[in-house]
Design a protein with these regions (language model features):
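Nucleotide-sugar donor phosphate/pyrophosphate-binding loop at the beta->alpha transition
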Residues: 1-12, 59-60, 85-86
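A charged, aromatic-enriched C-terminal amphipathic alpha-helix characteristic of glycosyltransferases
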Residues: 44, 53, 58-59, 201-203, ...
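Short hydrophobic "strand-cap" motifs at the C-terminus of beta-strands
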Residues: 22, 79-81, 108-110, 125, ...
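Nucleotide-activated donor-binding/catalytic signature segment of Leloir-type glycosyltransferases, i.e.
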Residues: 107-142
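A short, active-site helix/loop in glycosyltransferases that binds the activated sugar's phosphate group
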Residues: 5-42, 47-55, 188, 192
Length: 244
């Protein structure tokens, strides 16, 4: 109850016109937990049309604009988000360190990441307010998505296992291949649609192999990412939700 601010969410779900979630497995779990007669509708976390394109101009941060300009000949492995126990990324920094100098690892975060500053090819960048962070996203070579199930936090491990990150759509909008860890929410999006690689273990060896795999098959992964994004008809599901 504390997680729902005192609201009886089961009672609310039964009284609702439509119940909407953002991922297929979450729909199944919600129906089972709440004993709903109807499977909840699924509306993805795909951002609304935004006008950004590959290698967009950086307009909201002079420091970011300068960094991106300095990296114009580099291949950016990009992570954008919180860095914590649920999203450990040091193995990626180590992997990029071991690969050739055409690659750099960029971390855009508000988290303190002192442990990453020792890596020569890791670049830290502060947040840029949404949606303008997508200007930086548009310059990435590979996008990173990490969701590690943890216990003892206010959310269930299922929140990570059946993640539905908007990042999948932000990266795929630009045809950026992705690397994720091996959980259903990423395996059955990234790998199922052949738009990237899910590593079997979160270590330097597997991240390095994944980066090389994407580099060797870049056009295929990139094309599939664009198709995945274009095939998500969010507006149609919204229309369905509004029907009686």
């Amino acid at each position: 109850v504390s997680h729902t601010m005192g609201v009886d969410i089961v009672k609310l779900a039964h009284a609702a016109h439509k119940v909407i979630v953002c991922e297929y497995n979450r729909a199944q779990i919600t129906q089972a937990w709440f004993k709903l007669k109807e499977l909840p509708l699924i509306i993805s976390n795909k951002p609304m049309p935004n006008g950004f394109h590959r290698q967009s101009e950086i307009t909201r941060s002079e420091s970011a604009k300068k960094v991106i300009a300095e990296l114009k000949d580099k291949k950016i492995i990009l992570y954008q988000g919180v860095v914590d126990v649920e999203r450990p990324i040091e193995s990626i920094a180590k992997a990029v360190e071991e690969l050739d100098d055409s690659l750099v690892f960029m971390v855009m975060t508000g988290s303190k990441c002192e442990h990453l500053k020792k890596y020569r090819k890791t670049i830290m960048m502060p947040y840029i307010a949404a949606p303008y962070h997508l200007e930086v996203t548009s310059h990435a070579f590979v996008g990173i998505l990490i969701y590690t199930p943890v216990y003892g936090t206010f959310t269930s491990p299922l929140n990570s296992i059946y993640c539905a990150p908007n990042k999948i759509y932000e990266f795929s909008q630009f045809g950026i291949p992705m690397i994720g860890n091996d959980i259903p929410g990423l395996r059955y999006t990234i790998e199922y649609n052949h738009m990237g690689v899910c590593v079997p273990k979160m270590n330097t060896k597997y991240f390095a192999q994944a980066i090389q795999n994407i580099a060797d098959n870049y056009n295929t992964f990139s094309s599939n990412a664009v198709k995945f994004n274009q095939n998500d008809n969010k507006s149609e599901v919204v229309r369905l939700a509004l029907k009686k």
